[in-house]
A protein has these predicted regions:
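Non-cysteine beta-strand/loop elements that form the S-adenosyl-L-methionine
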Residues: 75, 278-296, 382-393
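Short acidic/histidine-rich active-site segments
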Residues: 292, 337-346, 388-390, 417-440, ...
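Conserved, mostly hydrophobic/aromatic
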Residues: 167, 220, 281, 290, ...
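Divalent metal-binding segments
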Residues: 11-38, 42-266, 293-348, 362, ...
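Phosphate/diphosphate-binding loops
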Residues: 247-282, 363-369, 373, 399-423
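Glycine-enriched alpha-helix->loop->beta-strand junction motifs that scaffold or abut catalytic
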Residues: 356-362, 378-387, 420-423, 445
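Histidine/acidic-residue-rich catalytic or RNA/ligand-binding cores of hydrolases
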Residues: 168, 233, 237, 349-357, ...
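C-terminal cap of metal-dependent C-N hydrolases
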Residues: 23, 436, 448-513
Length: 513
């Protein structure tokens, strides 16, 4: 449940009876207690509290109470569109994907000229999501996708969202030049941002967003940092006007909207809807390098499987120069914006730290999938947060074995970061991994989703640490805590006697009341 800072529960407040407070970061009272929520905060913790006349009463029935959970890196509209896309996540080759596309085209043949939104269009766009080419034996081609799509435009988004596999009709639709292979990185992101335009009517897309928010609430989510492409602040202002008011949101922008954001005088933390405290301005998001899957993450050393003679020396490449990055961040700082820098390769991370130091900006490193030995101490000294997505390590395990086997001890190094004093914030990067905080927690604690042993277990977090990294710094519920809380049916810190696989399953099915 989420209660605004101004207004609280209808009728003036809420008394939650008979809950067991989970000790996230400090000891808690023994046994069941009552929590009084008023004005957006916890105002009293005790046993047998008397209900005030204007309070609603909720019986917790002995459930466990934790602070509301957050996902610190989401592309919410793209996540909402997943239900209508072909799921290519289980594929291991181009042939596997082509089989799925061929089957979907055949199944949809009866749709004729009907678009997914019910309007009339000659070529309804078919979308898919989830394949990862890093472990494929060859790269996919436009021609082979043409051969199975029967003249229908097709866009297949990679599992890391850093490239799109388009057929010729889709290339024409988006005004791109013919080519043999995929569309990647800077050329790709504007296309990715527009996919919602072809997923049905605006009303249908927003209905999908509402369904995604409801599903997130059911998993205990009370807040997200939404770094959706396009104008996320305007999207959330419109959603507020349309009645979507149950989720805390920090809406970020990208460099293409920095000028208009600064001109509007918006700083990180400013309310996007006057008088409504749940929707705030978020950070400036900067994508400084690429991804592991596309082999565009910027590294100090070449990828082990790099193609000889590659234009980037097999190390990936930065998306902007060090000087341009520092200048962008300086402008953001002067305008009151924090900066969230996407940095996956170790060279990209070190360059981002240089830019933070030069610009004086505050904020976070997003992903930090491969870190240099000096990075944790530098991040701590700069006061930066590591915004990490633990479920990605489950997806990237084979790719790292192929691309970075000589440096895997520095991949997803959560323990190294935390031990150096770097605050961690867990997220999903949905749709790259599902918007499910319990999945992220399970992956951070048990670095294997299956019967295999944990991958680099020395970098695991404890369950308490992972939970603490998922609650937006709120810690154990107490007087003065934000009045966002989740009641769960089982002890989230329990299950210690279970084996790795069983404990992972225990966390992933955590039932929220």
């Amino acid at each position: 449940m989420t209660t605004p800072d101004a207004g609280g529960a209808p009728g003036g407040g809420l008394l939650v009876r008979a809950v067991r407070v989970v000790a996230v970061d400090r000891p808690t009272p023994d046994g069941e207690v009552d929590l009084r929520l008023r004005g957006g905060v916890v105002t009293e913790v005790g046993v047998g509290l008397a209900a005030a006349g204007d309070e609603q009463v909720l019986d917790g029935e002995g459930r466990w109470a934790i602070p509301g959970l957050w996902d610190k890196h989401v592309h919410l509209t793209q996540w909402a569109l997943q239900a209508s896309r072909i799921d290519t996540s289980g594929t291991t080759s181009a042939e596997d994907v082509l089989t799925l596309v061929r089957a979907r085209v055949a199944a949809d043949a009866g749709a004729g000229e009907l678009s997914s939104g019910g309007g009339r269009t000659a070529y309804p766009l078919l979308q898919g999501y989830g394949h990862r080419t890093a472990t494929w034996l060859r790269e996919p081609t436009v021609a082979e996708l043409d051969a199975v799509s029967a003249g229908r435009p097709v866009v297949l988004v990679s599992g890391d969202a850093h490239h799109g596999w388009l057929n010729s009709r889709a290339l024409q639709l988006f005004g791109l030049a013919p080519r043999e292979g995929v569309v990647a990185e800077d050329e790709w992101f504007p296309i990715f941002a527009r996919l919602g335009e072809y997923a049905g009517s605006p009303q249908a897309v927003e209905a999908a967003v509402r369904s995604a928010v409801a599903a997130a609430h059911a998993r205990g989510i009370v807040g997200i940092v939404d770094v959706e492409w396009g104008d996320a602040p305007a999207q959330w202002q419109a959603r507020y006007a349309g009645g979507l008011r149950s989720l805390r949101v920090r809406a970020g922008v990208y460099a293409d909207r920095l000028d208009t954001t600064l001109a509007a005088g918006r700083a990180t933390g400013d309310l996007l809807v006057p008088g409504f405290p749940l929707v705030e301005m978020g950070p400036l998001k900067v994508i400084s390098d690429g991804s592991l899957n596309t082999r565009t993450a910027f590294c100090h050393e070449p990828y082990v499987d790099a193609v000889p003679g590659a234009a980037d020396d097999g190390r990936g490449a930065p998306n902007l120069s060090s000087a341009d990055l520092a200048e962008l961040m300086r402008r953001a700082r002067e305008g009151g914006l924090q900066v969230a820098v996407h940095a996956i390769g170790d060279a990209a991370l070190d360059a981002a730290l240089d830019a933070f130091a030069a610009s004086g900006a505050a904020g976070s490193i997003e992903h930090a999938q491969l870190i240099s030995p000096s990075a944790p101490a530098r991040m701590a000294a700069l006061g930066l947060t590591a915004s990490v997505q633990p479920a990605h390590l489950w997806d990237d395990r084979e790719a790292i074995t192929r691309c970075w086997p000589d440096r895997d001890e520095r991949c997803y190094a959560f323990r190294s970061l935390l031990s150096a004093g770097v605050p961690l914030a867990l997220g999903s990067d949905a749709p790259v991994s599902p918007l499910d905080p319990w999945l992220a927690i399970a992956a951070a604690v048990h670095r294997s989703p299956d019967a295999r042993s944990a991958w680099r277990p020395e970098q695991s977090l404890t369950l308490r640490e992972a939970l603490a990294a998922s609650v937006d710094g709120q810690g154990t519920l107490r007087v003065g805590s934000r009045a966002d809380l989740v009641l769960v049916e089982a002890d989230p810190l329990g299950g210690d006697g279970l084996g790795g696989g069983d404990h992972t399953a225990y966390l992933r099915r955590m039932p929220c009341a």
